[in-house]
Amino acid sequence: MGICASSMEGEKTNTDINLSIEKERKKKHNEVKLLLLGAGESGKSTISKQMKIIHQSGYSNEERKEFKPIITRNILDNMRVLLDGMGRLGMTIDPSNSDAAVMIKELTSLQASIVTDCWGELNEDQGKKIKALWTDPGVKQAMRRANEFSTLPDSAPYFFDSIDRMTSPVYIPTDQDILHTRVMTRGVHETNFEIGKIKFRLVDVGGQRSERKKWLSCFDDVTAVVFCVALSEYDLLLYEDNSTNRMLESLRVFSDVCNSWFVNTPIILFLNKSDLFREKIKHVDLSETFPEYKGGRDYERASNYIKERFWQINKTEQKAIYSHITCATDTNNIRVVFEAVKDIIFTQCVMKAGLYS
């Protein structure tokens, strides 16, 4: 009896294990894992925020309030960068704005944790001083020449232009405010949502060089890679070393992703920050980064040239690179683009295994 009972228990255990394996297999069949990769400042985290807005319930009032200290840091840090840049370029501010400049330097000299706790909200008086600085001719000139002295976030003008609203006592961050915030991504962050009966896992990993060693831990069971490139940063240098061109770094990283790490995985290329690129190309020729480029300061020619540079990297003939021009802060644009991405992924899955019949 003891032997029979033991045998039956063993069979039950095996059955439970098999059922568990089958359940997990079916779960994975109904799950799409998108790995969001790209160099730093390419807009990956903004894409993740858009998925929460579009495919989840968006941000609650409490969640919006949590962004206020981040917005404060962005405003203060960005203005400090401009003031320091003025010093490097030998510029001066209007004497009437001296107190405002001192205020910025004092606040940003505090440790980040103290500033976040004590200055989670800027008051109206501080807002007026920041607004005065933003309209200062010297600060405006430094803004135009920012690429000469720093990697100033491209969202800086957005926050300065909105300073009155953001320092109101009743201020609650909007979707656009949240989308424009900049916090360096560290570690791995997941955004989960459903479209129909299919579960999506969007995995965002930090893009700075120090964060890329964490990418390997996310490579299992990837359905497709979404690779983000900032079109507008073709003339800027990396935050990490201030000597490597950002576009050339993106090309190098894309080569590793396409030809080494994900040879058999669909890759969707987001050529991001198209709005900023459209304006910049009018003033900064793409040939400064790519001397062989002869298309002049034409948006369509320049964006197509960059797209083709990435396409040419692919060494696997049977693998297509799907590309989209994107503006990560434009919710309507990302909604339309992601519909196309969804169709690409579903088609690939059907062709490969008939999972979503």
Curated annotation (Swiss-Prot):
Q: Tell me, in a sentence or two, what this protein's role is.
A: Guanine nucleotide-binding proteins (G proteins) are involved as modulators or transducers in various transmembrane signaling systems. G alpha-2 is required for the early aggregation process and most of the known cAMP receptor-mediated responses. Interacts with downstream effector gflB, a Rap guanine nucleotide exchange factor, to regulate the balance between Ras and Rap signaling at the leading edge of chemotaxing cells.
Q: Which residues form the G-alpha domain?
A: 30-356
Q: Where is this region: G5 motif?
A: 326-331
Q: How does it assemble?
A: G proteins are composed of 3 units; alpha, beta and gamma. The alpha chain contains the guanine nucleotide binding site. Interacts with the RAP guanine nucleotide exchange factor glfB.
Provide the protein name: Guanine nucleotide-binding protein alpha-2 subunit
Q: Which GO terms describe its cellular component?
A: cytoplasm; cytosol; heterotrimeric G-protein complex; plasma membrane
Annotated region (G3 motif) at 200-209
- Lipidation sites, kind N-myristoyl glycine, are 2
Cofactor list: Mg(2+)
Show the Pfam families listed in the entry: G-alpha
Region annotation G2 motif: where it falls in the sequence:
177-185
Q: How is it modified after translation?
A: Ser-113 is transiently phosphorylated following stimulation with extracellular cAMP.
Which keywords describe this protein according to UniProt? GTP-binding, Hydrolase, Lipoprotein, Magnesium, Metal-binding, Myristate, Nucleotide-binding, Palmitate, Phosphoprotein, Transducer
- Which residues, per the entry, are lipid-modified as S-palmitoyl cysteine? 4
State the PANTHER family in the record: GTP-BINDING PROTEIN ALPHA SUBUNIT, GUANINE NUCLEOTIDE-BINDING PROTEIN ALPHA-2 SUBUNIT
